[in-house]
């Protein structure tokens, strides 16, 4: 019987060897994810940016700093949650990953979620949301904050990606994302 840590290490090693799509050709590092494997809440973004590609860590650039700040404002310590992305290699020029690239990485994300087995997943942005609704085009603006029933009784809470907040600085958008994080917290099952 493997521990969660051992299982996640197996996933990580497989991601490092992956050549299933062209994104592997230009990566500096794969960005598998990081955080608490015993968490009840997982945050999923789109894909690594330049800083993430350099460091091999998710959400460490400007959007990551904002995510950490939003978590703190919600009473969540970053080290208490798990943070990852749909794709594990940086798309060139930080473009949106193609459906083919997302599909090539999808089984890795599914494995991560299966290992952690959270109660709730926060989908950060339209690309992450698309993964949880089988690739359908859904407007994040229309569905954000509304829980989506997903595999194994998990709830997915869509919200805006922190990079969207950086591009559209607004106290109202910030308030909305904080509200969505609070809603996600409400789906965490109490132990015992």
Swiss-Prot record:
Uracil binds at residues 45-47, 59, 85, 161. Remains fully active after heating 15 minutes at 85 degrees Celsius. Completely inactive after 15 minutes of pre-incubation at 95 degrees Celsius. The keyword Hydrolase applies. [4Fe-4S] cluster binds at residues 18, 21, 89, 105. CDD domains: UDG-F4_TTUDGA_SPO1dp_like. Pfam families: UDG. Keywords: 4Fe-4S, DNA damage, DNA repair, Hydrolase, Iron, Iron-sulfur, Metal-binding. It catalyses: Hydrolyzes single-stranded DNA or mismatched double-stranded DNA and polynucleotides, releasing free uracil. Its EC number is 3.2.2.27. The keyword Disulfide bond does not apply. GO terms for molecular function: 4 iron, 4 sulfur cluster binding; metal ion binding; uracil DNA N-glycosylase activity. One of its GO terms (biological process) is DNA repair. NCBIfam families: UDG_fam4. The seven N-terminal amino acids are important for maintaining proper protein folding and increase temperature stability of the protein. Removes uracil bases that are present in DNA as a result of either deamination of cytosine or misincorporation of dUMP instead of dTMP. Can remove uracil from double-stranded DNA containing either a U/G or U/A base pair as well as from single-stranded DNA. Belongs to the uracil-DNA glycosylase (UDG) superfamily. Type 4 (UDGa) family. This is Type-4 uracil-DNA glycosylase.
